């Protein structure tokens, strides 16, 4: 409370001080951050307070004489600070900082302690300059400084808003250390870290100046931030980053949080940072010198020094990243994640800019982002740097989250690092700018260089991390940072350009982070590795695109290794990693998914993720974007940053990345991230989303998402926005990235960027995406990545449109990646996604996801999973709907939920994160989320969809809403039920946790499942194909899917049920090949959703947790199913045919994705129809579908039901429990809906009817499903029957198309099919 009170007291002072100083914008932002409409005139001004303090404090007295001169000198020297003597400046700076932000002074001292005299001096000058000066001065004084200020400011600002406000002034004064910490965090994490700070600063300072300054500035900056922001603006250009930075402020809130976290991390990292800082500094300085400094500074500031350094490194590019830090500020973790995301984003943007501008910059941005992330991460970055320098240090940041992991990650990192490095060089080279390269070289080189590069590498690492780290980076950073740091660095560095990618990753993370932030953090630590990989990915992405390929493999390897390596640590990390990667990939999604999966499969996923990432990497931008997006691409905004996911970091994507683990988790920024610039743009949007999501989610630190938001988010301060942003960012990045992450998605997926809300990401809140976003955004998704929300990233998914798509895809992928199930798939998915992502990404991203994913995945079982995941991701919407519903749901939730749910689910949702986390948690969360979240997911789904599929969102949104509404309405009932249960489920999450365990186990299975799915492949493929039929539609469908998710979400639960069934029916899945196809086909209406769900389920299926989640979800499903059924009348019908054909023709993986796509399509159509005909459709559907379905599905259903009933026994117990919570009914309903839908194909009405039956059936079905073996045979038979019937029904459906009722039926059929498919 004290802090809040102080903040309340400080804000007005800061606000007025800013106004007096002429920093109107900053003042306005402060006011916005504070949430107050007006500030009363303060009788006392900060200057008065500062003066008094100066006179009364020992420091003041000692420095008084000096200060007097200094103050004047500062004021006059505002622009000069950089050159001012650093010692005196330090002191002066301290004073100035103090003056500027009371808190700052102390920090300043710390800073001065920090030793970045130059920066301090600068800072001081800046400080003195007052905020206004700060901006300008900082800018001029030292670009760095400016950046710093910016960053600092942002962070500060955020902090301020958060707690940092106090931080800013009072705290600093009072809690100088404390505030500083946070602020420092922002700034440098200085206070506590004075030295740390210093180091941080150093790093930040990198440009030493910057950093020191940063610290002081941070508080100051914070105050100044706004202004600083401007001027530093880094100003805008170099400042692109700065621009990002500016957003940072928004982030700042996040930043504040981040700052706090960062502070902690920073402290840990401080040392590392310190050393690193030095190196970085050198590095930075080398690089920075040119313009970097200012940027760096800004960046540094933002990132908190680290970021800063990174920033510095990234220089301008980083600036934004810095901003991210600001973001970080709010959520240190998030911030970090976010930062990264944002950073990424910024980075991305900057990167883009930077890249042009300065490779280094790019790097830096990433690095910075990373830094940021690190910062948040902490120190991770620092640690990372440290790590580079001294892995351990890194650990700190990461350690913080992953300290333990750190080691692991480190190892992993190392490997990765090397791997990366190897690749990186390419990437780096690719990246090329000399500076960049250099760092890259260094980086690549490595590690050694790492150290050297620390700055670079470190930064790079950071950078890479950042973006990715932001998501991945973060994660990576953690991991990478730590160890990979170098590597990462290398990668990142190498990535310079990659950076963006990385940034993207970051973003993704952010998205995720946000949501995932937590996760991320955790993940991050763990993820880090992933991150690292992702980072690499990112960098690869960025860099390479060329590199990408190569890096990819390496990365992949790395990642894999990393992932694997990190897995343990990375479990979450993995997630994160994955995430990151995913982030990168999906960043958020990945994160999320990966996290989940990863957690579960982590290794796998990690690999997958990595793969994905890598896959994504190329795409990565998308992915990374996602990731980065998250990271923004995060920055995705960051251009890539968030990219979404990673995009650069936006983070949003949440996925952004951002994750600091927390962020990651939290954020989503979760969302994650992405497209570089475009992505960026989107990512940002997404990111925020993601971010927002995430924040809610994880960080709810919006930060996480915020992260995604990173810059965007920042801009989107709204964390939620952030989330979206995250997602969006993610998306964007994704877009850029392909929005790889489409947004956070990417890693943030869309954030990922998504983060949509940063992941909508954020799942945390949203989802949990650092971006992008997550809902950043994306978040998951990237969608969320998220922020991807749109995409997943909210971006994630779609949203940001591109990103989103990408994100979505990414997210999805990420998820897949995460799921990893299909590494390749993921990769492919990712890649695919990436491509499409970029293309489709936007709207279809999901679709793309689906398609791509599926396509890619199709080949691979993993792919399938990927598909699943992807699908999930893509589906984020769809998946969201289905798997995602669980996973996706998270995703979507992230996106959608991002905020809402993400928060709630927080974990779950981080879209990306969620995804990542989700995956691990996915079941859990999924369950959890699915239920609660899902319900929300439904609602969220909309959001998710919206977010995730932002692009799609509209359709979805509206439709979805209707649908969602319908479904939601119904769903909601269940949801409510479910929520209760859902939240029970959430609690169930515990169960789910168990489930998760199961899930984990199942996860293991999942891969198998995918294989099964593969088996199913033939049919499902067709189905999927059908889905794929219309990527765009798919997208829309996907949108629908989210809706479906809603449908599915509820449906998903249903799907989950289906999934459960799938799970249960895993046998069914096994039989799935046939059954799935047939059922899927037949069930398509339901199947579609169900399939989707099932797909999700499939994904989930593998996961027991999912089953449970399914069960938990079941309730939702039934309701959803009904509506879904109703909803997807015509489309469904169409789908069935196509689905059937496709199922027959295509491989399951594709099938799944496609199915989802078709489902989405159907859903979309249905949504529209539903809107118009929802009522009629429901009624007619009820009647006709009941009849038809009863006739058609009944036959099929009967077999299925029978099977299920038979199966029930096994699962009955299981189901009972699951369903018992409420899930029972819901589940039954869902199941029945599923079964009924599938089996009976009861449309809405029937669904209703069946619901009762369904409950029993569902339960039984679930039980039955549990008995895989029995189910299988029966299922196969059933499937065959269903297929026949489905065909019949298709005919009927066609007829019914005219009639809405048919739609529902077919929808159900499709769902069933899908369920079957997923089951497969």
UniProtKB/Swiss-Prot annotation:
UniProt-recorded name of the protein: Treacle protein
Ranges: Sequence repeats: 212-295, 296-366, 367-436, 437-505, 506-550, 551-624, 625-680, 681-714, 715-774, 775-839
Residue spans of biased composition, Basic and acidic residues class: 336-345, 1014-1026
GO CC, one annotated term: nucleolus
Composition bias type Low complexity, residue spans: 186-205, 213-228, 246-272, 422-435, 566-597, 633-643, 733-749, 843-855, 937-946, 1124-1136
Keywords for the protein's UniProt record, in alphabetical order: Acetylation, Isopeptide bond, Nucleus, Phosphoprotein, Repeat, Ubl conjugation
Keyword Phosphoprotein set for record: yes
Subcellular location: Nucleus, Nucleolus
Segments of skewed composition (Acidic residues): 273-288, 346-358, 660-677, 822-833, 992-1002, 1030-1039
Composition skew (Basic residues), residue ranges: 1272-1296
Quaternary structure and partners: Heterodimer; heterodimerizes with NOLC1 following monoubiquitination. Part of a large pre-ribosomal ribonucleoprotein (RNP) complex, that consists of at least 62 ribosomal proteins, 45 nonribosomal proteins and both pre-rRNA and mature rRNA species. Within this complex directly interacts with NOP56 in an RNA-independent manner.
Region entry 10 X approximate tandem repeats, spans: 212-839
Chain residue numbers at which the record places covalent cross-link Glycyl lysine isopeptide (Lys-Gly) (interchain with G-Cter in SUMO2): 126, 521, 635, 655, 1082, 1092, 1249
Compositional bias ranges of the Polar residues kind: 130-139, 361-372, 442-456, 806-816, 866-879, 896-928, 1057-1079
Function per UniProt: Nucleolar protein that acts as a regulator of RNA polymerase I by connecting RNA polymerase I with enzymes responsible for ribosomal processing and modification. Required for neural crest specification: following monoubiquitination by the BCR(KBTBD8) complex, associates with NOLC1 and acts as a platform to connect RNA polymerase I with enzymes responsible for ribosomal processing and modification, leading to remodel the translational program of differentiating cells in favor of neural crest specification.
Residues the record lists as Phosphoserine modifications: 83, 85, 87-88, 151, 154, 169, 386, 413-414, 433, 443, 590, 593, 662, 664, 669, 671, 760-761, 765, 767, 794, 853, 1034, 1191, 1216, 1242, 1301, 1303
Residue numbers spanned by region Disordered: 57-1138, 1175-1320
Cited InterPro entries: LisH, Treacle, Treacle_dom
Protein source organism: Mus musculus
Pfam family name, one: Treacle
Keyword Phosphoprotein in record: yes
């Amino acid at each position: 409370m004290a802090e809040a009170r102080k903040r309340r007291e400080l804000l007005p002072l800061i606000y007025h001080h800013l106004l007096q100083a002429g920093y109107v914008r900053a003042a306005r932002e402060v006011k916005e951050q504070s949430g107050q409409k007006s500030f009363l005139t303060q009788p006392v001004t900060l200057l008065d307070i500062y003066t008094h303090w100066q006179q009364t404090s020992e420091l003041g007295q000692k420095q008084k004489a000096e200060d007097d001169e200094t103050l004047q000198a500062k004021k006059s020297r505002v622009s000069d600070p950089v050159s001012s003597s650093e010692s005196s400046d330090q002191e002066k700076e301290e004073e100035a900082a103090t003056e500027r932000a009371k808190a700052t002074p102390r920090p300043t001292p710390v800073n001065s302690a920090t030793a970045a005299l130059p920066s301090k001096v600068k800072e001081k000058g800046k400080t003195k300059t007052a905020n206004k000066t700060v901006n300008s001065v900082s800018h001029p004084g030292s670009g760095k400084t400016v950046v710093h200020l910016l960053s600092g400011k942002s962070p500060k600002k955020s902090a301020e808003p958060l707690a940092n406000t106090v931080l800013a002034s009072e705290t600093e004064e009072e809690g100088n250390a404390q505030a500083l910490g946070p602020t420092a965090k922002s700034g440098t994490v200085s206070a506590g870290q004075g030295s740390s700070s210093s180091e941080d600063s150093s790093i930040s300072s990198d440009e030493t100046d910057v950093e020191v300054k940063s610290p002081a500035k941070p508080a100051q900056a914070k105050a100044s931030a706004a202004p600083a922001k401007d001027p530093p603006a880094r100003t805008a250009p170099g400042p692109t980053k700065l621009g990002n930075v500016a957003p940072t402020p928004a982030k700042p809130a996040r930043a504040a949080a981040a700052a706090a976290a960062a502070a902690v991390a920073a402290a840990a990292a401080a040392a590392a940072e310190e050393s690193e800082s030095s190196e970085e500094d050198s590095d930075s300085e080398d690089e920075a010198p040119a313009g970097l400094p200012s940027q760096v500074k800004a960046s540094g500031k933002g990132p908190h020094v680290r970021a800063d350094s990174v920033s510095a490194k990234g220089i301008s590019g980083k600036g934004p990243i810095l901003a991210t830090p600001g973001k970080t500020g709010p959520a240190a973790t998030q911030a970090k994640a976010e930062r990264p995301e944002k950073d990424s984003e910024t980075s991305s943007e900057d990167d883009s800019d930077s890249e042009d501008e300065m490779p280094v910059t790019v790097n830096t941005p990433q690095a910075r982002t990373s830094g940021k992330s690190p910062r948040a991460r902490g120190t991770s970055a620092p640690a990372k740097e440290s790590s580079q320098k001294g892995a351990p240090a890194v650990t700190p940041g990461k350690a913080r989250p992953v300290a333990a992991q750190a080691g692991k990650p480190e190892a992993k990192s190392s490997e990765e690092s090397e791997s990366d490095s190897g690749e990186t060089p390419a990437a780096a080279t690719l990246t090329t700018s000399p500076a960049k390269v250099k760092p890259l070289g260094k980086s690549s080189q490595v590690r050694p260089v790492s150290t050297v590069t620390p700055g670079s590498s470190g930064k790079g690492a950071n950078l890479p991390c950042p973006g990715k780290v932001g998501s991945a980076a973060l994660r990576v950073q953690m991991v990478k940072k730590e160890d990979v740091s170098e590597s990462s660095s290398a990668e990142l560095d190498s990535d310079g350009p990659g950076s963006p990618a990385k940034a993207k990753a970051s973003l993704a993370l952010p998205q995720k982070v946000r949501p995932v932030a937590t996760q991320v953090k955790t993940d991050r630590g763990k993820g880090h590795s992933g991150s690292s990989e992702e980072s690499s990915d990112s960098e690869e992405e960025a860099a390479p695109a060329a590199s990408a390929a190569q890096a990819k493999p390496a990365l992949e390897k790395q990642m894999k290794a990393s992932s694997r390596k990190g897995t343990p640590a990375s479990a979450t990390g993995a997630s994160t990693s994955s995430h990151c990667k995913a982030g990168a990939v999906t960043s958020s999604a990945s994160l999320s998914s990966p996290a989940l999966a990863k957690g579960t499969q982590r290794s796998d996923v990690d690999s997958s993720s990595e793969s994905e990432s890598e896959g994504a990497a190329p795409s990565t931008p998308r992915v990374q974007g996602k990731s980065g997006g998250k990271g923004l691409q995060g920055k995705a905004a960051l251009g890539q940053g968030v990219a979404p996911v990673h995009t650069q970091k936006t983070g949003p994507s949440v996925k952004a990345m951002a994750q600091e683990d927390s962020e990651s988790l939290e954020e989503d920024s979760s969302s994650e991230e992405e497209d570089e610039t475009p992505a960026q743009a989107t990512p940002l949007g997404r990111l925020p989303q993601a971010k927002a999501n995430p924040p809610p989610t994880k960080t709810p630190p919006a930060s996480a998402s915020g992260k995604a938001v990173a810059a965007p988010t920042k801009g989107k301060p709204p964390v939620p926005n952030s989330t979206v942003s995250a997602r969006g960012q993610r998306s964007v990045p994704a877009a850029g990235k392909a929005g790889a992450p489409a947004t956070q998605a990417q890693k943030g997926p869309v954030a990922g960027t998504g983060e949509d809300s940063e992941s909508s990401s954020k799942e945390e809140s949203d989802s949990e995406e650092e971006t992008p976003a997550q809902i950043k955004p994306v978040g998951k998704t990237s969608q969320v990545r998220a922020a991807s929300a749109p995409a997943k990233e909210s971006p994630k998914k779609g949203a940001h449109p591109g990103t989103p798509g990408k994100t979505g895809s990414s997210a999805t992928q990420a998820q897949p990646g995460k799921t990893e199930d299909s590494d390749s798939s993921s990769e492919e998915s990712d890649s695919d996604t990436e491509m499409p992502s970029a293309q489709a990404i936007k709207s279809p991203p999901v679709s793309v996801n689906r398609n791509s994913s599926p396509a890619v995945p199709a080949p691979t079982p993993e792919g399938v999973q990927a598909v699943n995941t992807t699908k999930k991701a893509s589906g984020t919407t769809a998946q969201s709907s289905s798997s995602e519903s669980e996973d996706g749901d998270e995703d979507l939730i992230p996106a959608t939920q991002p905020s809402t749910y993400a928060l709630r689910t927080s974990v779950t949702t981080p879209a990306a994160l969620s995804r990542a986390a989700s995956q691990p948690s996915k079941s859990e969360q999924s369950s959890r989320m699915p239920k609660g979240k899902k319900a929300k997911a439904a609602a969220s789904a909309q959001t998710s969809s919206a977010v995730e599929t932002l692009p799609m969102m509209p359709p979805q949104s509206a439709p979805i809403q209707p649908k969602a509404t319908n479904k939601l309405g119904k769903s909601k009932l269940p949801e409510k039920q479910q929520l209760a249960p859902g939240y029970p489920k959430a609690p169930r999450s515990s169960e789910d946790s168990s489930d998760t365990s199961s899930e984990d186990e199942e996860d293991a299975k999942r891969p198998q499942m995918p294989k099964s799915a593969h088996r199913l492949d033939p049919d499902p493929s067709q189905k999927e194909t059908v889905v794929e039929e219309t990527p765009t539609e798919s997208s829309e469908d996907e949108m629908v899917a989210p809706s479906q998710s809603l449908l599915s979400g509820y449906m998903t639960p249903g799907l989950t049920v289906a999934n459960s069934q799938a799970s249960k029916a895993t046998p069914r899945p096994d039989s799935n090949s046939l059954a799935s196809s047939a059922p899927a086909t037949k069930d398509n209406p339901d199947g579609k959703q169900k399939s989707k769900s099932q797909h999700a389920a499939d994904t989930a299926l593998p996961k027991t947790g999912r089953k449970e989640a399914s069960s938990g979800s079941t309730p939702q499903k039934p309701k959803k199913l009904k509506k879904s059924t109703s909803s997807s009348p015509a489309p469904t019908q169409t789908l069935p045919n196509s689905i059937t054909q496709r199922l027959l023709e295509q491989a399951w993986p594709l099938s799944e994705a496609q199915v989802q796509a078709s489902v989405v399509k159907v859903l979309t159509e249905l949504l529209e129809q539903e809107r118009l005909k929802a009522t009629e459709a429901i009624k007619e559907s009820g009647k006709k579908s009941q009849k038809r379905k009863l006739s058609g599905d009944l036959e099929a259903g009967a077999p299925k039901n029978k099977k299920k009933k038979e199966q029930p026994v096994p699962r009955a117990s299981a189901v009972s429990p699951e369903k018992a919570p409420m899930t029972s009914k819901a589940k039954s309903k869902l199941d029945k809906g599923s079964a009924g839908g599938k089996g009976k194909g009861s449309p809405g009405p029937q669904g209703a009817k069946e619901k009762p039956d369904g409950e029993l059936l569902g339960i039984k079905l679930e039980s039955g499903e549990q008995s895989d073996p029995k189910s299988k045979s029966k299922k196969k038979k059933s499937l065959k029957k269903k297929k026949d019937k489905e065909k019949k029904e298709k005919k009927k459906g066609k007829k019914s198309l005219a009639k809405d009722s048919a739609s529902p039926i077919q929808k159900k059929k499709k769902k069933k099919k899908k369920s079957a498919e997923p089951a497969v």
